[in-house]
C-alpha cells in the first residue's frame, strides 16, 4: 500500500523571534502555535492508528510505504524543547517495542543525516536560510526487514537534487515561480519478490 502524506503546516500567529522571546508577557502567538502543534499531532495520531491496523498482521503481510511532505509546524525545534512536544515523524514511525508495526526511514543513516529537501528563511536564526529534510519515505517492517515480498533496494533512497537543480532558473532561484517545486523530490526503489 502506498500512503501519500501531506501534513498541514498549519500556519500560526507565531512568526518572529521577537514573539517567541516575548512569550511571557504576550503569550497569544505561542499559545496559537501550541494549538497548531496539537492539531498536527492529532492528524499524525490518526494516520498512525490506520497504519498500525494495516501492518499489525505481521511483517509478511503488511507492506506499506508512507511518503510525502511531513510539515512539522512553526518553530518545531524550540516548541519541542520548551514544551516537551514530540516530533510528528517520531510519532508516526511508532515504537521499537512493537517491532511488527515499527516503520523505518528508507534512506541510509549516513545520507539521512545530511539530506535536505527544502530551504527557507528561519526567523530564529535572524532570517538566515536553513535547509531541512521534511519529505520522507517510511517503510513498514514487511519491507525494511525483508520478511515480506517487497524489499528496499539498498542505498536507493535519495533526494533528487540533480533533477530539481536542472529545472531551476538560477538567476532568480529564490522566487517560487523559478523553481519546479518548493521541495526537492525524494525517490526510492522497492523491489518485488513475485
Predicted regions and their residues:
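Structured beta-strand-rich core segments of catalytic domains in phosphoester-bond hydrolases
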Residues: 1-12
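Metal-dependent phosphoester-hydrolase catalytic domains
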Residues: 53-65, 70-194
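A solvent-exposed, charged loop/short amphipathic helix patch at secondary-structure junctions
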Residues: 10-37
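A long, amphipathic alpha-helix that forms part
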Residues: 30-59
